[in-house]
Amino acid sequence: MGKPIVAIVGRPNVGKSTLFNKLAGKRISIVQDTPGVTRDRVYAEAEWLRYNFTMIDTGGIEPENNDIIIKQMRRQANIAIETADVIIFIVDGKEGLTAADNEVATMLRKSKKPVVLVVNKVDNLKDENNAYEFYNLGIGDPMAISAGQGLGLGDMLDEVVKHFDKSIYDEEDDEYIRIAMIGKPNVGKSSLINKLLGEERVIVSDIPGTTRDSIDSHLETEEGKFILVDTAGLRRKSKVKEEIERYSVIRTYAAIERADVCILMIDATEGITEQDEKIIGYAHELRKAIMVIVNKWDLVEKDDKTLDKFKKDLQSNLKFLSYAEYLFISALTGQRTNKVLKLARYCYDNYNKRISTGILNDVISKAVLMKEPPIVGIKRMKIYYATQVATKPPKFVFFINDESARHFSYERYLENQLRDSFDFKGTGIQIEYRQRKE
């Protein structure tokens, strides 16, 4: 399972973005070579009391018309209810209670999701009385904060983490491998899942997932136990396309966050699109295990070079996914669908792989002997030792002499040496460099 998801909901100009940015701190980062992923910063990683969680800003555009605001608030509340484990409902202590606040509070009450009600813009003790009228919303005790000044945020976060399912932080492995099928509507995600379930005929149950557009299907096979998550995406028509796009991204991101293996499905008759690159970019950022499946391969006119050319074109567009596994199938005819779960299991095993410290350091020592680090300025990086500190994804820490002696091309060389030596095909890996004295 992924980290808990916390969604921030509120009217325009109540301080959602201020709170989001204050909590995220410096944890929002733009990853190079990942097109369009973090430019619209709808999510960020955060931590409180050693609990890591993901924050989602349901904001979007900021209309001025009151009717549009209420419609937007309904959408925000829906997306929070569907994707989040805990909801922060932020209201404006200076402006007071509004019709839109009441509307959303009603939806949140019905959802039964944990809600933390925060009254923002309470910048001093004199303004604390402004919070009391929000008891009328009927969703618990209002907590007075000032997002701009950082006042009251600790108490608010204490309340948020109280609602987390602490069992997800246990080290024990989940017995199910979670696979998220991601991609545009109508590329064949549901068809493939139905094919896999139909062939195996050992469905445990169909359980409504965290969003109205996701269905979690439990499946047991010779390859292991799987949960297949079909992310249908938003299909509602709306004039506010940017807003709908944002909510679609949030839904998809929530599915990716909770997955072990992410399968990007592409329509062979359309090829890859910018939206595909953006979607799989999230999985790459989180260093998930990744497969790219090209569906409807039966509809493509082929010769003996077609598959190789198509794959090379894909890899050219997805340069940041050099480690991903590729598979060409037809969910309709069943062509190569029998290989999907085998390949997913292979990617997952690499995602969950652990390397002993002794063997790891032997490989790094040999890599340095074959090609020593370049001199950066007047210093050359020296690696004292390396160790693996986590799996899912594999995370390594290299202890070095000087941070300023690092060079991106040599770091890429070391990552390639790890991948070649230990077979991390199909999964992202993370390498952290820490300076220490000799």
UniProtKB/Swiss-Prot annotation:
Limits of the EngA-type G domain: 4-168, 177-352
Annotated KH-like domain residues: 353-437
Coiled-coil segments: none
The entry's keywords: GTP-binding, Nucleotide-binding, Repeat, Ribosome biogenesis
One Pfam family of this chain: MMR_HSR1
Binding annotation for GTP 2: 183-190, 230-234, 295-298
Highest taxon listed in the record's lineage: Bacteria
Example GO biological process: ribosome biogenesis
GO MF: ATP hydrolysis activity; GTP binding; ribosome binding
Binding site residues for GTP 1: 10-17, 57-61, 120-123
InterPro entries: AAA+_ATPase, G_ENGA, GTP-bd, GTPase_Der, KH_dom-like, KH_dom-like_a/b, P-loop_NTPase, Small_GTP-bd
Protein's job: GTPase that plays an essential role in the late steps of ribosome biogenesis.
Matching PANTHER family: GTPASE DER (PTHR43834:SF6)
Family: Belongs to the TRAFAC class TrmE-Era-EngA-EngB-Septin-like GTPase superfamily. EngA (Der) GTPase family.
Subunit structure: Associates with the 50S ribosomal subunit.
Name by which UniProt lists this protein: GTPase Der
Organism: Clostridium beijerinckii (strain ATCC 51743 / NCIMB 8052) (Clostridium acetobutylicum)
Gene name as annotated: der
